[in-house]
């Protein structure tokens, strides 16, 4: 039995990640494809993260970084098991978000990556570019929904993309929504059909 693919969607806040994930789930109906999003706010760490994001509690940046990381590690075994059972996972945010946001706040990217080292490695990361309209919509109730901060996050994403150790697919914000939806669907289908070998380990 071939394993499933780990496909991650990344991008700035309000770039359309959740929408595109849901499009995939609807356009490729299958009992071998599941959706997962981070942070998972139902767990102990997830509830702490939710309190932080909604400004109910404050923590120092190092604690915040570790909370997001721990939230992903809570699901590392689940992800590994699902992939080995032939289940493809469509994931809304992953370790790259954690590293980009931490680095945008001044943390060492190398140190932040070390916390995530060993997580299941994605077979494909789809990065959704944000146009000026989407970036300017990044004003909201949650703590990171700030235009200036989001621009810093974007620069950190670009650094990771340029490293070339992960298979990134950048989706331009210039595409019309129906074109973007079809393009992403085809990219995901190809990734599912071409995945080979054992599940890798991220940043090892």
UniProtKB/Swiss-Prot annotation:
| Enzyme Commission number(s) from the entry | 2.7.4.9
Query: Which InterPro entries does the record match to this protein?
Result: P-loop_NTPase, Thymidylate_kin-like_dom, Thymidylate_kin_CS, Thymidylate_kinase
Q: What class of enzyme is it?
A: transferase
- Keywords from the named record: ATP-binding, Kinase, Nucleotide biosynthesis, Nucleotide-binding, Transferase
Pathway, per record: Pyrimidine metabolism; dTTP biosynthesis
* Catalytic activity, reaction form: dTMP + ATP = dTDP + ADP
Q: Which residues bind ATP?
A: 11-18
The biological processes this protein is annotated with in GO are: dTDP biosynthetic process; dTTP biosynthetic process; dUDP biosynthetic process
A Pfam family per the record: Thymidylate_kin
- Cite the SUPFAM superfamilies for this sequence: P-loop containing nucleoside triphosphate hydrolases (SSF52540)
Give GO MF terms, alphabetically.
ATP binding; dTMP kinase activity; nucleoside diphosphate kinase activity
Q: Which family does the record assign?
A: Belongs to the thymidylate kinase family.
NCBIfam families, sorted: DTMP_kinase
What is the protein's given name? Thymidylate kinase
Q: Gene of origin? A: TMK
């Amino acid at each position: 039995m071939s394993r499933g693919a780990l496909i991650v969607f990344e991008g700035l806040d309000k770039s359309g990640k959740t929408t595109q994930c849901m499009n995939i789930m609807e356009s490729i109906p299958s009992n071998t494809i599941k959706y997962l999003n981070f942070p998972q706010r139902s767990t102990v760490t997830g509830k702490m993260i939710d309190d932080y994001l909604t400004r109910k509690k404050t923590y120092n940046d190092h604690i915040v970084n570790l909370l997001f990381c721990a939230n992903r590690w809570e699901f590392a075994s689940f992800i590994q098991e699902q992939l080995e059972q032939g289940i493809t996972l469509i994931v809304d945010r992953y370790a790259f978000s954690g590293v980009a946001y931490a680095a945008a706040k001044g943390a060492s990217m190398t140190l932040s990556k070390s916390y995530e080292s060993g997580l299941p490695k994605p077979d494909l990361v789809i990065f959704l570019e944000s146009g000026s309209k989407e970036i300017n919509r990044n004003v909201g109730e949650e703590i990171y929904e700030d235009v200036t901060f989001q621009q810093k996050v974007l620069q950190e994403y670009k650094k990771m993309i340029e490293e070339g150790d992960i298979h990134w697919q950048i989706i331009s914000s210039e595409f019309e929504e129906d074109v973007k939806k079809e393009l992403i669907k085809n990219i995901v289908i190809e990734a599912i059909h071409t995945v080979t070998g054992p599940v890798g380990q991220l940043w090892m």
